[in-house]
Amino acid sequence: MQATKSATFSREEQLRQLGELRERTTHVDLNDARIRDVAGIAPASFATGWIRPFQDTDEHYGKPQIGLADLDQLQLALVAASQIWLIWQRDETGRAIPLTMTVEGTKFVGSATLGACHARAIRRGQNILDAGVLAGFTMKDVEDHYRDEATGRVPVQLLDERLANFRELGSVLQREFDGHFVNVLRRADGYLFKPDGNGFIQLLERLFPRSFGDWPLAKLPYVFTFSLLDLRESRHFPEEIDRLLRFKDLQNLEGGADYYRPWFFLRVGVLTIDDELKSRLRKHQLIEAGSSLENDYRAATIEAMRRLARAMGGDYVAALRLLERETHAQALLRCRRCRVGISDEELPCPYRGVCKATHVDHELMDCVFPLVLTSEY
């Protein structure tokens, strides 16, 4: 959703508008009992480290694709965050599947595909870390960036929007931040939201509206924040950068309202969907961007993440960070492989005992993740 011209991008405005979206919801509801079930399973599931082996599968899940110096790694994080959306394609039958490509001789499935393309560009001398290069990007640059080596084609969708995002990053970085993302962090000074409108989430929404504009849901800004928190913990940044990444108001985090989280939630029964939405998902039909169907499952996903984090107890921010990883991975790595009657030996899953699609409504197992042609998630 694009913000209105009168948007202030304050946290208070965001909470009010998110509440209004939930009040208007008609296609999706939340199941409190199933929320308690999932909240009781998620911490132990995540603690097993089950996600880690998928670094070595075609998903390459969570595996860094290139190692760079500190400032370059931050710059790449911005570029990657502006492109990590619409990561699916249609197969030869018209059914939706995760984006699948061969990059530098390796097969990739899902979100790691885009990261592999960014790394390939850098290794081949296309300096996507330079704001001037980004500002001058052409359609040929985008097509070369996302070309599948196995087919010679470009399976990534909405190339015009991807080109616009590359160019916006470059021009705004040059105009406002001396070409460097670290200066965005310096202006935010360790806050997601500030009274003067210069918090990190606010800067992304306000100054990069093509790349990050999605108000009040702010999926890409929030997912970018989660990735920066993980990046900070995975390496030893200089003191200044480390301080800038220690956001002081993490209580203002929200879960990412994308398509994988609601897919897991509807499969397991955290979300209850009506027949109209279920029919579209079973038929792999597009949902109109900005429609009530889209707004309903996205707003409900944010509320579900809040309730799950509270139900887990303890540190709310730590719970939300765990859920952000667990729910996305569960959908891509497990739900995608699941079917009615699959054995625990073939696909271990701690949520199977409470899974609505498995035990109550088998039609939910036919549902694909929500399909929207959008650059917001």
Over which residues does each language-model region extend?
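Secondary-structure capping and boundary motifs in well-ordered enzyme cores
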Residues: 213, 217, 253-257, 293, ...
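Short charge-dense sequence patches
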Residues: 202-208, 249-257
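Hydrophobic/aromatic-lined pockets within catalytic cores
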Residues: 174, 226-233, 265-273, 306-309, ...
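Short acidic alpha-helical/loop segments enriched in Asp/Glu that coordinate divalent cations
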Residues: 231-253, 270-280
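Phosphate/adenylate-binding glycine loop and adjacent helical scaffold
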Residues: 1-218, 229, 233, 272, ...
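Alpha-helical phosphate/pyrophosphate-handling elements in metalloenzyme active cores
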Residues: 221, 225
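Residue-level detector of well-ordered alpha-helical segments, enriched
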Residues: 165, 217-220, 257-260, 318
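C-terminal structured domains
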Residues: 247, 258-263, 267-268, 278-377
